[in-house]
Design a protein with these regions (language model features):
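Short alpha-helical interface patches
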Residues: 47-53, 64-119, 218-228, 274-285, ...
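Sequence-pattern detector for short linear motifs
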Residues: 9-12, 101, 518, 547, ...
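Basic- and hydrophobic-enriched, low-structure N-terminal and domain-boundary segments
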Residues: 1-153, 157-162, 499
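A short glycine-/small-residue-rich loop at the edge of a beta-strand within enzyme catalytic domains
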Residues: 111-115, 380, 416, 473
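P-loop NTPase motor domains
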Residues: 141-437, 452-453, 462, 521-545, ...
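Conserved ATP-driven motor cores of ASCE-family P-loop NTPases powering translocation/secretion/packaging/pilus
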Residues: 429-431, 435-532
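A broad, low-specificity signal for short, low-complexity segments enriched in glycine/proline
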Residues: 102-111, 121-137, 157-158, 326-332, ...
Length: 596
C-alpha cells in the first residue's frame, strides 16, 4: 500500500515565494549585465553569482514580471505533472498480500524469550503492555489469541502446552477430561505454582467452590442468576422459542431465592444447598387457587419486616404470574436446578476453598477447571465460575493504582464451546486487555464460534489480534473464510503462442493477475505440521507448528508430566507456604480445670 500523502498546504506558498525570488533575481541580473543577449542570459543563469549575491532583488517592472512568470510557470508544471500522472502500483495491481518473515515479527518479540507468548515454532508475541511506537507504526497488540483446529491438529500440544511452559503468567484453564492437569499439574507445582483444581469429573478430588463467596451486592446476584438460567437449559446455545415469561419468571424467582440466602442467612448457610432448600418450600399446602406455600409465608414476613428488600421485590415480580404459570415455572426451575441435589455437587458447592481472588495476586497461581467430555450436565458450574473469575480479576485490577494485575493472567480455554455460554463475553474480551488479562480461545472450527455466540461472534473474533489456524477440516465455508482473511497477491502469468506454418512464429507475453495467497484447497491440504498465523496489521505467516519437545522447559514435562496430579505434594507445599508466612509464634499454657 502506498504511503499517505503529506499535507501540501504549507509547502505550496513557500515554493511560490522561492520561484518568485529566483525569477526576480534572474531578471534583475539580466538588466544589470551589459553585452550581448547571450552574455546577459549566461550571467542570469550563473549559480555562483546567485550564491554570492542572493538578495540582488528589484521592484522594477521587468524584474517583478520575471518573478511572477517564473512562479506561474512552476505552478503550471506542477499541475501538469499532478493531473497527468497515473496511479500505478507495480506488482500490486490485484492485491498486495505476501507472507511475513523474521523482519515482520521481530518488533513484536521480547529479547528475553521467557517474556514471550509462543504462537508458532518461529513466531511469538511479547507480553509487555507497552511496545514500541514509531512515526509509521504502533507495535502494541492485545494478547488475545483465537485458535482453530480440528481434532488431532495439536491444539493442546502446539498451543496450550508451550504457553503453559513459559511460566510467565497466572493461568485459568478449561480442561476437558483432565489431560492438561495430568500433563502439567505437577510441572507447575515444581515451579512454585499454587495449583487449584475444580474437578467436575472426579468430584471427590475437587477443591470446593461456593459462588456465594464472590457475591457482594445485587449486581452480582443478577449476573450469576442470568448465567445459571442461561446455562441450565438443555442447550444453552440454542435460541429459545418458548414464551419469554417462562425464562423471565424463573429468573425473578431464582434472584429472590439467591437474594434471600445472601442477605438473610448466616454466612455458613450461604450456598446453593440453602437455595435448593428454599426451592422445595414452594410446594403448596393445598390445591385451591388461594393456596399458599411455606415460601410464600416466608417472603410475606420478609416484605413486612423489610419492605425494601431486593429478595422480597423479586419474589413479588415472580408472583405476578398466574397460578398455573407459576406452578409450571416452579417445576421447570426445580428440574433445571436438580444437579444441586446430587450429593457430590452439593458437597463441593457447600463452602469455598478455591479462593479465586488469589489469581489476581503476585503469587504464582494456576486454576484447572476439569469437565467431563461425555456429558455437559455440569458445565453450567464451569460457566458461572469463569464469569465470576473475570469479574473478580477486573475488580482487583481496577482497585490497584496502575489499574492492572500485578502478574499477567491468561485464560487458556481449550474446547471453549463445551463450557456453555458466558453472558456478555463479547464485552468482557474487549475490556480485559487494559487489566493485563488475556484469553487463548480454542475451537475446532469457525462454525463452533458462530454457534456459541451467534450475534456476537464477529466482535469476539475481532478482539483477538492473533489467530492461529492449525487446520480447517473440509468445511467449504471455513476454508473460504480463512483464504479471504489471508488476502490476494498479484502474480505474473506467462502466455505463449506458437505458429507452425511456413512463416512460423513464437511469442511470449506476461500478464498480471490476482491470486489468493492460499486457495481453500491449499488450506485443506496443508501439511499437518504447518499452520497459519495472522496478527492484526502484519503480513500473515505460514509457519511450522510449535513442537512442544523443542521448548526449553520440556525436560520438566519429561520428569513430572503424565502422572496423576499429586494432591499430597500440593498439601505439603501449601503447609510449607503457610509456615513461611507465620511472623510471630506465641506459646499458650493450657491449664486443666481441677474439679476437686
Amino acid at each position: 500500500m502506498n504511503q499517505p500523502k503529506r499535507n501540501l498546504k504549507i509547502w505550496i506558498p513557500i515554493a511560490a515565494v522561492l520561484c518568485f525570488w529566483l525569477g526576480n533575481w534572474m531578471g534583475h541580473t539580466y538588466e544589470l549585465t551589459e553585452g550581448t543577449t547571450t552574455h546577459r542570459l549566461a550571467a542570469a543563469l550563473n549559480l555562483n553569482s546567485l550564491l554570492l549575491h542572493p538578495f540582488r532583488l528589484s521592484a522594477d517592472a521587468f524584474s517583478l514580471g520575471c518573478g511572477i512568470a517564473t512562479a506561474l510557470m512552476a505552478g503550471l508544471i506542477y499541475l501538469c505533472v499532478k493531473y497527468s500522472r497515473h496511479r500505478l502500483m507495480p506488482q500490486k495491481e490485484y492485491g498486495s498480500a505476501r507472507w511475513g518473515g523474521p523482519e515482520d515479527i521481530a518488533p513484536f518479540q521480547d529479547e528475553n524469550a521467557q517474556n514471550n507468548l509462543p504462537l508458532t515454532a518461529s513466531e511469538s508475541l511479547s507480553l509487555s503492555p507497552k511496545m514500541k511506537v514509531t512515526a509509521n507504526d504502533n507495535y502494541n497488540r492485545n494478547k488475545n489469541v483465537i485458535v482453530f483446529g480440528p481434532s488431532g491438529s495439536g491444539k493442546s500440544y502446539s498451543v496450550a502446552g508451550p504457553q503453559l511452559l513459559q511460566f510467565n503468567s497466572n493461568y485459568v484453564l478449561s480442561d476437558p477430561k483432565g489431560e492438561l492437569l495430568q500433563e502439567y499439574g505437577n510441572v507447575l507445582l515444581s515451579q512454585g505454582y499454587k495449583v487449584k483444581v475444580f474437578n467436575l469429573k472426579d468430584r471427590d478430588k475437587s477443591d470446593h467452590y461456593n459462588l456465594f463467596a464472590y457475591i457482594k451486592n445485587e449486581d452480582d446476584i443478577l449476573v450469576v442468576t442470568k448465567n445459571l438460567v442461561k446455562n441450565l437449559k438443555e442447550d444453552p446455545i440454542a435460541k429459545s422459542t418458548a414464551d419469554p415469561i417462562w425464562e423471565e419468571g424463573m429468573t425473578a424467582l431464582l434472584e429472590a431465592l439467591i437474594g434471600y440466602v445472601f442477605y438473610e442467612l448466616e454466612p455458613e448457610e450461604r450456598n446453593m444447598n440453602s437455595v435448593m432448600t428454599l426451592l422445595l418450600m414452594l410446594e403448596s399446602q393445598g390445591d385451591g387457587p388461594n393456596s399458599v406455600s411455606q415460601l410464600d409465608l416466608l417472603f410475606d414476613d420478609l416484605s413486612i419486616n423489610k419492605p425494601n428488600s431486593f429478595a422480597a421485590k423479586q419474589y413479588k415480580l415472580y408472583k405476578m404470574a398466574p397460578g398455573k404459570t407459576a406452578q409450571s415455572i416452579n417445576v421447570s426451575l426445580g428440574l433445571r436446578m436438580s444437579a444441586f441435589n446430587i450429593p457430590s455437587i452439593a458437597n463441593i458447592c457447600a463452602d469455598d476453598a478455591i479462593d479465586l481472588r488469589e489469581l489476581g495476586s503476585e503469587k504464582k497461581v494456576a486454576l484447572f477447571v476439569v469437565t467431563p467430555d461425555t456429558t455437559t450436565a455440569y458445565n453450567f458450574l464451569a460457566a458461572v465460575m469463569f464469569q465470576q473469575c473475570f469479574q473478580i480479576l477486573v475488580d482487583i485490577a481496577d482497585h490497584r493504582p496502575d489499574k492492572r494485575l500485578p502478574r499477567h493472567l491468561r485464560f487458556l480455554l481449550d474446547e471453549f464451546p463445551n463450557i456453555g455460554m458466558i453472558p456478555d463475553f463479547q464485552i468482557l474480551i474487549s475490556t480485559i486487555r487494559s487489566r493485563d488479562i488475556a484469553c487463548t480461545l480454542i475451537y475446532q472450527s469457525l462454525n463452533q464460534l458462530k454457534s456459541q455466540y451467534k450475534d456476537d461472534w464477529a466482535t469476539i473474533y475481532e478482539n483477538c489480534d492473533s489467530m492461529i489456524v492449525l487446520g480447517a477440516g473440509g468445511n467449504p465455508e471455513n476454508l473460504e473464510f480463512f483464504s479471504k482473511a489471508l488476502g490476494k497477491a498479484t502474480i505474473e502469468v506467462m502466455n505463449t503462442s506458437e505458429n507452425k506454418g511456413s512463416q512460423g512464429s513464437y511469442t511470449k507475453s506476461y500478464q498480471a493477475l490476482g491470486r489468493e495467497l492460499m486457495t481453500p484447497e491449499e488450506i485443506r491440504t496443508m501439511p499437518r505440521n504447518w499452520c497459519l498465523l495472522m496478527i492484526s496489521g502484519v503480513a500473515p505467516f505460514y509457519s511450522r507448528k510449535y513442537n512442544l519437545k523443542d521448548h526449553p522447559n520440556y525436560h520438566l514435562v519429561e520428569a513430572e508430566g503424565g502422572k496423576p496430579f499429586d494432591y499430597d505434594r500440593r498439601a505439603e507445599q501449601s503447609f510449607a507456604d503457610f509456615i513461611s508466612n507465620v511472623k510471630d509464634v506465641k506459646t499458650v499454657k493450657l491449664c486443666a480445670e481441677n474439679n476437686n
